[in-house]
Amino acid sequence: MGNDADAAVHRRFREARDYLLHNREDYATAYANFEWPRFTEFNWALDWFDQIAADPANESRYALWIVEEDGSQGRWTFPELSRRSSQVANWLRQRGVRRGDRLILMLGNQVELWETILAAAKLGAVIIPASTLLGPADLRDRVDRGDARHVVIRSADTEKFAEVPGDYTRIAVGEPVSGWHSFAAAYSADAAFSPDGPTGADDPLLLYFTSGTTAKPKLVQHTHVSYPVGHLSTMYWLGLEPGDVHLNISSPGWAKHAWSNVFAPWNAEATVFLYNYTRFDADALMAQLDRCGVTSFCAPPTVWRMLIQADLSALRKPPTKVVGAGEPLNPEVIEQVRKSWGVTIRDGFGQTETSVQIANTPGQPVKPGSMGRAVPGFRVVLLDPVSGEPSSEGEICLDLTHRPVGLMAGYADDDERTATAFAGGYYHTGDVGSIDENGYITYVGRTDDVFKASDYRISPFELESVLLEHPAVAEAAVVPSPDPIRLAVPKAYVVLAAGHEPSGETAESILRFCRQNLAPYKRIRRLQFADLPKTISGKIRRVELRGRENEAGERRQQGEYREEDFPGLKS
């Protein structure tokens, strides 16, 4: 594109962004009138990031701020990251990285991660984000199925690739490693970058290996618009504005990291703030929030649950924008934070395959237990699983007659799965929800997690929410357990909070609490104290727990408590 065309693309993106900023607390107007900017050619790193970096208003504004556990820190302005990423892009090009090449990026929260994301985008390369927790077997899968031609990793992780065959460029960040290119050499490259041609808006940019809860990871393909432009919806949910300092607790390699540590905050011209720690410490985290003036905070339910175990009042200057993501938050957590900080955690819902679809947006009433309403740019429909017709409860789907920009291109390795996901004119999320007369959607569960007990439909999430209100319960997962009379009954796997013993007395207390707070047909009738199996990204693998129950059949498992063990429960 020429200069005039480049300027027009930037202007259209900015107009859409500014419309959402202007109507940040006017949901009705934003939802009714927002229109996605749609492009034929678009490169977010060049057409947006480099352009805002050149804006005099951002000359001294920090794009990235990383604080280490020992108190050391690094801060980089928008112009600095623009220049450094162009150097990295030129250097990667010299190492053979070409448009369309797939590049595994496996780094921690360090500046080189963001530089490489921007550099790869400028080059038109396809990024395969990878967690530093992955081992050789997972990495072989990514190299093979991902057809990776280049890898950029920490020097400390190079040994993992000794067991990963393949003809790929090896680049190490950190100490020099024999046989690997040193990333540090990139900073000697020219800072003036020119692309080798235009970037198609639908060209691939990201390839995510999802941490599926039921099967082998899927390859979710995103384009140069589906995440960069699509995350305007995430920016709207977070409520970010220029000048905000945003902390999102998420590990590199997973989609949520790109959501809230790259695209959404930089779309808003906000600062991405990171606090690196080896072990979570609620008091230390709150001290950093205070010291660094964090204005916006996003965390998964596990972190929120650990935070409420601490003295929340120790935080003198709470963030004014707080959200929860990953899995729906339980109402009792939201209430405790509201009482201590005077702000309401706003839930949202999205997937690796999408940007945020449903959310409690700024300035709007929050319905306890609800994920919120469809965000601007998304037309959400709940489809009955039997009739396929719109219903007040059903699978959460996106209407493709108004296809949102923030939706994947498809599954790169599976045309059949892609066709299934986009069947019938809808994108099918595989999640079940219910909707009220005001459009608020409440999460019910994955389509394969919801089950029937005595012919009643049971939502694991609803029962888990009640369990988590008990002081002895840190985490919980509910699955169906085979029963000769009811066919299945709800069984809870429980991780205890610190200071509580896995005893019959504790089990009776939890079961009694559930009887007092659940309708009779929803009662948890069996309970077992155990660690919860999780995916590498932290999602509970209920499918594994269901498998244990099916294997045991009606036989009582070791360490399992049943309601009939406690005759006093009926009193």
Regions found by a protein language model. Give the residues of each.
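Conserved pre-ATP/AMP-binding loop-to-beta segment of ANL
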Residues: 59-62, 178, 188-209, 215-216, ...
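ANL superfamily adenylate-forming
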Residues: 68-71, 156-201, 557-558
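Conserved AMP-binding A3 loop
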Residues: 74-79, 205-229
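Conserved structural elements of the adenylate-forming
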Residues: 82-87, 201, 220-241, 249, ...
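AMP-binding/adenylate-forming catalytic core of the ANL superfamily
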Residues: 134-135, 141-142, 153-154, 297, ...
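Conserved AMP-binding/adenylation subdomain of ANL enzymes
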Residues: 228-245, 252-295, 310-311
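Gly/Ser/Thr-rich phosphate-binding loop
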Residues: 267, 294-298, 308-367, 379, ...
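Conserved ATP/PPi-binding loop(s) of AMP-dependent carboxylate-activating enzymes
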Residues: 387-420, 458
